[in-house]
Amino acid sequence: MELSYATTLHHRDVVFYVTADRNRAYFVCGGSVYSVGRPRDSQPGEIAKFGLVVRGTGPKDRMVANYVRSELRQRGLRDVRPVGEDEVFLDSVCLLNPNVSSERDVINTNDVEVLDECLAEYCTSLRTSPGVLVTGVRVRARDRVIELFEHPAIVNISSRFAYTPSPYVFALAQAHLPRLPSSLEPLVSGLFDGIPAPRQPLDARDRRTDVVITGTRAPRPMAGTGAGGAGAKRATVSEFVQVKHIDRVVSPSVSSAPPPSAPDASLPPPGLQEAAPPGPPLRELWWVFYAGDRALEEPHAESGLTREEVRAVHGFREQAWKLFGSVGAPRAFLGAALALSPTQKLAVYYYLIHRERRMSPFPALVRLVGRYIQRHGLYVPAPDEPTLADAMNGLFRDALAAGTVAEQLLMFDLLPPKDVPVGSDARADSAALLRFVDSQRLTPGGSVSPEHVMYLGAFLGVLYAGHGRLAAATHTARLTGVTSLVLTVGDVDRMSAFDRGPAGAAGRTRTAGYLDALLTVCLARAQHGQSV
């Protein structure tokens, strides 16, 4: 199921996703999505809820839902009223966590920590320890779509092992609510006061909001009683219209890659390649790692190349220098702590962008190196998996940490007025990254302040100097008082460039966007410096 939005708005520490007609806003809460409509004619707007519900262990029973309801009652959470008589949404499951007291504690979260051993076993059909993380929602900022999963992504909290969900426990549902939970109502108060009302059409047709159905079946609409028990049944007319999505049939495309001379180099690495998300083969990255420096830097590397290929060699050599400097004089940028050559860093940089289907010269770089390998008959050994993993994770986490800190800082309109020394390059990169994040979150309107640029620049300055991400986050947290930066970057340090599932896909997409934004401003700055 997909819900489209046009822009985002921060209101009372909640991220709201506003539709194109500005009459409806969504927000994520504990792996579920709430929808609130603009009040009209002194009447409250329609309130709806979308997401996964827990049901039972078979097609007919509701054992799991009853278990959750029973546990909520035993814990004295009488104010919590699951929607309907049979199903319980994921955000109610969150309340079984001892650290969560109300739905307000899990606002802006796409997943649910299930620490209850019995419930975790229901979800996975396996005994798990210490618990599992169940993800039901993904926000695709690039497409401006909130995606609700037909089947959740479930991973072990500690080992990140991925489980297959039990077949009957989860179902996708859509519910009409008479009101929001009491803990969430204050967060929505005054929301539409800051969103200009659209001009009403002359024909005054009833509004409708399309819900795109991408799964095998449409979710069953429910009329929530808001009391968790039997109530008076009444008919309701919803503004939501379910629309089935049918994939376009296309002919498969085949991507070509330069074959190296060594037969074992054409085989995918047995560990990394199987664990890697879809994208260009990792063996192509390994070719550049192994022979890229020689292909671009050797005095006779250009022999036998066409004029266009010679220009490409010069271009890649120049870009590696502009971004990362030289081995003897490295430039302050992402990946400063990695013991790699500028060409190797450039290859990883382009690979992380290219595998998310963004424009990148990575294929051209691979072709040049492949030509060099063939012309010189080089033997390319099997990929060094630890080296590739360390390189990709290092640059991936640096970029994701920088972008995540930018997102966190933009949540604060006012930051402490201090004079923090920041280098010109770090300041320029900070401004570019903040503008990119702002374009993904808010309507254009100058929400990036000099303080935002200064404090993100301070974070980048520590990172560019080769210090750790947590050290940079701690430094910035002390300057701003935003201690959540340390926790957020700690979460980034536990992520991997090879993570699968919705969370992994979202992290890869965001990282590619951050890398692309920084690449553009760095190359433009270097070009301007040359012209001056």
From Swiss-Prot:
InterPro entries listed in its UniProt record: Herpes_UL21
> Which residues lie in Pro residues bias regions?
257-276
Q: Which keywords describe this protein according to UniProt?
A: Host cytoplasm, Host nucleus, Virion, Virion tegument
Q: What is its main location?
A: virion
Query: Which Pfam family is one of those matched by this entry?
Result: Herpes_UL21
- Please provide one cellular component term from the Gene Ontology annotations of this protein: host cell nucleus
Q: Where is the stretch described as Disordered?
A: 251-276
Q: What stretch or stretches form a coiled coil here? A: none
Compartment(s) of residence: Virion tegument; Host cytoplasm; Host nucleus
| Subunit structure as annotated in this protein's UniProt entry | Interacts (via C-terminus) with UL16.
Question: Per its database record, what is this protein's job?
Answer: May participate in DNA packaging/capsid maturation events. Promotes efficient incorporation of tegument proteins UL46, UL49, and US3 into virions. May also play a role in capsid transport to the trans-Golgi network (TGN).
Family under the similarity heading: Belongs to the alphaherpesvirinae UL21 protein family.
What is this protein's name? Tegument protein UL21
Source organism of this protein record: Human herpesvirus 2 (strain HG52)
